[in-house]
Regions:
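Sequence-structural signature of mature extracellular/luminal beta-sheet repeat domains
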Residues: 1-271
Length: 271
């Protein structure tokens, strides 16, 4: 466990890229090909350097450790937007300082001297999960995935204002409760070239089950595709033409979906 794997679609071989990553979750490449990750075990965003080392970014918001970063998205200005829910597993060292009194979307951005600082961006989330920036950089998509019966599981769209702050969100889709229990809501997600949102959602214990959904930018459900195992966790397009969808699951699977009829959109494709 606690590894980052590298899959070669040409050979079909999957190998260790990094081991002992301290429960790293969401990953994203920057414009210069650097790989950044949400290191939940250390409650930090980190950069995985080519020489095998790891660089730590700023991890304090107003002097306090933030929570347990889950997923991240890097915009064309190089700012790192990340979701910061409360962790379900303890972090050994940083637990000496308790969590924040909120679970928000935060943003890492550079100061003039190139050091990092953190800003709080949302004040209306309780368990933010997957996150994306739209192609035109004007919308932030956030999965609010709080599992309580009286909580919200929504796919949200926040307008990104000219000054970089977020406007009031629009709910694109709500995941409710059925006779079997609470829907899991959205986990990870990605975009296609038409701006549609491909999301991993659901589980076997309630609702229509584990599923890949395709939403239009306005929230219309364009497609649903059942997943044969429980808890799809994240997805991205890959291969040379970005027409193959790769899906991970909480059970440790990696699925490859060909002939999707879609082409993925990545602001910064892997080097």
């Amino acid at each position: 466990g606690s590894r980052i794997l590298r899959h070669d679609p040409r050979s079909g071989e999957t190998t260790d890229f990094r081991r002992y990553t301290n429960r790293t979750n969401g990953l994203a490449f920057s414009a210069d090909g650097q790989l950044y990750g949400c290191q939940g075990g250390s409650r930090r965003i980190v950069r995985f350097n080519a020489d095998g080392s790891t660089s730590l970014l700023e991890y304090r918001l107003d002097g306090h450790f933030h929570n347990h970063p889950n997923d991240l998205a890097i915009d064309e200005q190089g700012r790192i937007w990340f979701t910061d829910p409360y962790g379900r597993l303890p972090a050994p060292g940083p637990q000496l300082q308790g969590p924040l009194d909120h679970a928000s979307v935060l943003r890492l951005e550079r100061r003039v001297d190139r050091t990092w600082t953190i800003r709080r961006m949302t004040y209306d989330t309780t368990s933010p999960n997957g996150i994306l920036v739209s192609q035109d950089q004007r919308t932030l998509y956030v999965a609010e995935s709080d599992y309580g019966e009286d909580k919200r599981r929504e796919l949200r769209a926040y307008p990104i204002r000219e000054d970089g702050t977020l406007g009031p969100y629009t709910v694109l889709h709500t995941f409710g409760i059925d006779q079997r229990g609470v829907h899991r809501g959205v986990d990870g997600m990605c975009l296609d070239t038409e701006g549609n949102i491909i999301v991993c959602a659901g589980w076997e214990r309630s609702g229509p089950g584990p599923m890949i959904y395709v939403f239009s930018p306005s929230g219309q459900v364009l497609e649903t595709h059942p997943v044969p195992v429980d808890r799809p966790t994240n997805c991205t397009f890959g291969d040379a033409d970005l027409r193959t969808l790769y899906v991970t699951t909480g059970e440790g699977h990696l699925f490859r979906v060909r002939n999707t009829g879609r082409q993925g959109w990545l602001l910064f494709p892997p080097p």
